[in-house]
Design a protein with these regions (language model features):
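Short, acidic/polar
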Residues: 60-78, 153-163, 249-262, 335-341
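Hydrophobic faces of well-ordered beta-strands that scaffold small-molecule active sites
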Residues: 45-50, 85-87, 119-123, 172-176, ...
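Aromatic-rich peripheral "rim/lid" segments of glycoside hydrolase catalytic domains that contact
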Residues: 58-62, 129, 191-205, 300, ...
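Substrate-binding cleft and catalytic face of glycoside hydrolase catalytic domains
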Residues: 75-198, 204-216, 220-239, 245, ...
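Bacterial Sec-dependent N-terminal signal peptides
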Residues: 3, 13-39
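Boundary/entry segment of secreted carbohydrate-active catalytic domains
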Residues: 36-76
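Glycoside hydrolase catalytic-domain groove-lining segments
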Residues: 71-74, 233-243, 247-323, 340-347
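Acidic-and-aromatic substrate-binding clefts and catalytic sites of carbohydrate-active enzymes
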Residues: 56-57, 61-68, 91-103, 181-184, ...
Length: 385
């Protein structure tokens, strides 16, 4: 997720940092059981990362369908046209109320299984957020050697996936790392809340470069290889994804994937993040340039590396700078952009599109797709087409 510090500023203020546990979500009723398999064979998946849902529920937030009927969030995603769910997992988020630990992930994965939806597990290999700006080493792994840390990564991967397997969950996809644009398992200086501290030039301050793609490319590849092998040990048929941001950036993909392939690391699929809003904000690109560039890159990466590609994160502007729902005109533009991404990516041979945290309130995250009172906006209609 691009620049997570900025996009989550509303969430920190709204939810606070008081201690609690996710046990209340574990006790919630699961959605009404339909059947425990995917209902139809498809070669294209429409999905969402709704990892925040149990935390939102613990705060009393409810969700409603277009008719105004209260509906469990996972079931609502299916009603909106989705057939898959993506779930992030953190190593030890005890300082952040244990959301997205393996037990919390299991709660959400069970709901998806009950509804016949496919599941993607997204390993961050950190105790909290991992993205291009930071990939902080878990506290319990700090001070370990490279070889020890490879074992840490493999053991964590197998532990989480074995829990899924023991509970009848078979993930179709597993991400080994989240937006590992600059590698994985490298740390930056942070404040007490866990947010990165930047220098006078706006750059993060790297304190440990163990798996940094520029400083230690071989070790980045080694970590990915360890994760790949760990996934296959538990789920041999799972599709292992390497996930990078800025799907329009061909040079980035060649550089990063080149590090992996030249060092013997394998992957089954390339996952891309595609955010027209962030591309305009940080790279000066129009939405058309961003989307067109990504479609071309999907075809190029697939052909060059002989693998499938999926857009595992996207999102459209849903909130203004005050955290209020944007106008109907802006929502309509978001709908058109998303509909185009879904249509053109499918035509390009892409295997699916996942929206990142669409269920979020405008006051919580500006690129969600729901209203403040938990109803899908016009943006979500793109998944029904």
């Amino acid at each position: 997720m691009k620049n997570i510090l900025e996009v989550l500023i509303f969430a920190s203020a709204l939810w606070g940092l008081t201690a609690c546990s996710s046990s209340s979500s574990k006790d919630m009723e699961e959605p009404e059981k339909e059947e425990e398999k995917v209902e139809e064979v498809t070669d294209f998946y429409k999905g969402a990362d709704i990892s925040w849902v149990t935390e939102m529920e613990s705060k009393g937030h409810k969700f409603y369908n277009a008719a105004g009927k209260e509906t469990e969030c996972t079931a609502l995603m299916k009603e909106c046209g989705m057939n898959a769910i993506r779930l992030r997992v953190w190593v030890d988020p005890s300082k952040h109320n244990n959301w997205c630990n393996k037990e919390d992930v299991l709660v959400k994965a069970k709901r998806a299984k009950t509804l016949g939806m496919e599941v993607m597990i997204d390993f961050h290999y950190s105790d909290w957020w991992a993205d291009p700006a930071k990939q902080n080493i878990p506290a319990s792994w700090k001070g370990h050697s490279y070889e020890e840390m490879k074992k840490d990564l493999a053991n964590h991967t197998k532990e989480v996936l074995q829990l899924m397997k023991d509970n009848g969950i078979t993930p179709k996809w597993v991400q080994v790392g989240n937006e590992t644009t600059n590698g994985m398992l490298w740390s930056v200086q942070t404040n007490e809340q866990g947010w990165e501290i930047k220098d006078e030039n706006g750059n993060t301050i790297i304190t440990e470069s163990m798996g940094h793609a520029t400083r230690n490319p071989e070790q980045y590849a080694g970590f990915f290889a360890a994760g790949y092998d760990a996934v296959k040990e538990i789920f041999p048929d799972a599709i292992v994804i390497v996930h990078l941001d800025n799907g329009f950036d061909a040079d980035l993909y060649d550089w990063n994937l080149g590090i992996l392939t030249s060092n013997g690391a394998k992957f089954d699929m390339v996952g891309m993040s595609l955010y027209p809003y962030w591309a305009e904000s940080y790279h000066g690109k129009t939405a058309d340039q961003t989307i067109s560039g990504c479609m071309a890159n999907i075809k190029r990466v697939s052909a060059k590396y002989g693998c499938d590609v999926m857009i595992v994160e996207t999102g459209m502007l849903c909130a203004d700078e005050q955290g209020k729902l944007v106008s109907a005109q802006v929502l309509e533009e978001g709908y058109k952009q998303l509909a185009r991404i879904i249509k053109e990516s499918k035509e390009a041979g892409c295997k699916g599109v996942f929206y990142w945290e669409p269920e979020c309130k405008p006051s919580q995250y500006k690129l969600g797709a729901f209203t403040e009172d938990g109803r899908p906006t016009r943006i979500m209609d793109a998944f029904k087409e």
